[in-house]
Amino acid sequence: DGASVCIQTGTTTELNLAEFFTVNKISYEPVPIETNAEARENYLAGRCDVYTTDGSGLASTRATFDDPDAHVILPEVISKEPLGPVVREGDDNWADIVSWTLKAMQAGEELGITSANAKELGSKLNDNPEINRLLGMDPLQGAEAAGLSKDWALNILAQVGNYKESFDRNLAPLGLSRGMNALARDGGLFYVPPIK
């Protein structure tokens, strides 16, 4: 109760934090800041007890501290706001490619396709037609129209890996758990649509 909190003004985080403290009847002293860099500086200088932003932002900022382990990211989730890829308005083809890239990585995870086995799985027909479609042996409708080769998803999975591999490589080292970013079968929110 009564902690000072560095909070970026004009953001949904500011509103969500105010609601969280009101609902939980906790008093706090907001320390208004304008940028993440300013929040980091004020927090490290001790001008606020707590620093708040999106979980991924907290984790990546904490990783830059001299002693990251001396700082704790609290487990409370104040709000649920989806973060994802963004493309400029009006480039529908690029938006489709970005969207299907994410879906292909999630489908790869769901189907057990990894960077280690993608090329092998893509070299012969499989018993699972969805794997065959995803890896280009039974080309997806619309891939060529979007300017993609029939093995576009195979290339992504072989070079980058599935969603879990990418998450584990890039975000897990920051101390982030999958949480809602897991597949629906694993208790998360990611539902992989049929690959057709």
Give the predicted meaning of each segment.
Residues G10-L15, N36-E38, S56-S60, S79-K80, ...:
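Solvent-exposed loop/turn segments at secondary-structure junctions
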Residues T12, K25, K80-P82, D96, ...:
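Extracytoplasmic
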Residues S99, K103-K196:
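N-terminal hydrophobic or amphipathic helices and topogenic motifs
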Residues D1-R40:
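Bilobed "Venus flytrap"/periplasmic-binding protein-like clamshell domains
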Residues N16-V23, A37, L44-A45, D49-I73:
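A ligand-binding cleft/hinge motif common to bilobed small-molecule-binding domains
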Residues S4-Q8, Y51, V86:
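Short, well-ordered beta-strand segments
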Residues A63-L102:
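Periplasmic-binding protein-like
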